[in-house]
Amino acid sequence: MLIAVDHGNHAIKTVHHNFVSGLAQHSVRPPMADEVLEYKGEYWTLSGQRLPYRRDKTRDESFFILTLFAIAKELSYAGPLPAAEKIELAVGLPPEHYGILKDKFRAYFKRSESVQFSYNDKPMTILIRDVFVYPQAFAAIAPQKSQLKHHLRLFLIDIGGYTTDVLLLRSGKPDMQFCRSLETGVITMNNDIIRRVGALHDMQIEDEHISAVLRGKETILPADVKDTIRKSAEQHAKDILDQLRELKVDLRSNPAVFIGGGSVLFRDYLERSPLVASASFVENVNANAIGYQAMAEGQLSLLRA
């Protein structure tokens, strides 16, 4: 079975699921947890507290265990959880890191032997037969890339958890010589807002409060706290655009497609900005995973032909 996983610093996304990139480890099975994975004699549950940012996600087993959760969720979505399954895995990396980390990322997931674990007390054995690695951002627009061919130059801007990744398309084809990554994602903004709200309003808030305010959801936060959150988010969006201009990414003369959860949060500010002449948005936060799946399906079809 082919399964696509987008390993974000803030969230893990598959074609049908997304969850925070957070783990809690337990020496015994936690009695109240409704989703438990047992691997190598340890018990793991998903946590709302995301892992610290890491450029290289292969340095320990954390993202492999998160991937086991993702695989189990997708297998459960497809039907009754099988006792054994052969897996082809489609994953991605930021364009700027793609050339450097692609082989290492592939080797991290492709195990020579079967992997045994239990998901919600159901034993499973999987064999990851192959791993396909693709550039983020480009994957998100892969299903509609034919519609972008008429643009001589177009920037893909993926505002994610920790980074903002930029890729230039020339007549619909990625220019891998022009890919940039800025450490200006949603996590950096949230950390700044949490500090600011604490200093100005003597109140402790979390990432979920910020997301709810920016998405227009109901909260019990005071009006002045909401105002601080909105103004801070607008400033962060402006800072991203200013930094892009320093990298010679001028969105007054080139159209842009904005991707990622951050783009959804900042959409109102980006559309109103005089620094952006023409913008479209891919609002599905699972878009990269959907793109990985589509590209891997095409690659597998060629291999099997």
List PLM regions with ranges:
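Nucleotide/phosphate-binding catalytic cleft detector across ATP-hydrolyzing
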Residues: M1-L154, K173-T188, L200, D207-A305
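Ser/Thr-glycine-rich phosphate-binding loops at phosphate-binding pockets of nucleotides
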Residues: I159-D165
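PRPP/pyrophosphate-binding module of the type I phosphoribosyltransferase fold
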Residues: V166-S171
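A contiguous pocket-lining binding segment that forms or flanks enzyme active sites
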Residues: R196
